[in-house]
Amino acid sequence: MELFLTGKILKPRGLKGEVKVELITDFPHHFVKRKQFFVGVSPSSVVCMQVTKAALHGGFAWLFFEGIDTFEQATTLVGFSLFITEEELAPQPENHVYRHEIVGMRVVDGNGKLFGTVTDIFNMPAHDVYEVQVEGKTVLLPAIEAFVESFELASKTIVMSRCWEFL
């Protein structure tokens, strides 16, 4: 079963086991409607946990899990990630892709010369930023129209003619 990252537990809140979750989704309202998540450090070490209460506030999700009833129990979840199955992924609007489809894509310049490989995506307030591994170095590239010439999902290639400016 393939699992997909959708949130990260940041900290506990209050005495009754509530946790603050960083959302890694374009669909926060779908996130808080979920009744369960696979929770763990990585997709290979998860347990299925039932959500008893969920809310959105201040750009974060606030969750209560079944069996997590104290501050101390909630503290044990800090740093864990929340995953969902492929069947639970919300359909993407046209011209949108999932994060997991971008990670691993090749970045090439306008001449087709390989620049590097996308290893992560950061959701920043103004726009997303691609983390790209280039010959052992990490380079951050803005994911904006001015730099991204084309995005070819079938060939897993992002064309950015100005990528060399960021070295």
UniProtKB/Swiss-Prot annotation:
Q: Which GO terms describe its biological process?
A: ribosomal small subunit biogenesis; rRNA processing
Question: May I have one GO cellular component term?
Answer: ribosome
Q: Which residues form the PRC barrel domain?
A: 94-166
Gene Ontology molecular function, alphabetical: ribosome binding
- InterPro entries in alphabetical order: PRC_barrel-like_sf, PRC_RimM, RimM, RimM_N, RimM_N_sf, Transl_B-barrel_sf
Reply yes or no: does the keyword rRNA processing apply.
yes
Note the SUPFAM superfamilies from the entry. Answer: PRC-barrel domain (SSF50346), Translation proteins (SSF50447)
List, alphabetically, the HAMAP family matched. Ribosome_mat_RimM (MF_00014)
Any idea what this protein is called? Ribosome maturation factor RimM
**Which lineage is the organism of this entry classified under, starting from the top rank?**
Bacteria, Pseudomonadati, Chlorobiota, Chlorobiia, Chlorobiales
Question: What gene name is listed for this protein?
Answer: rimM
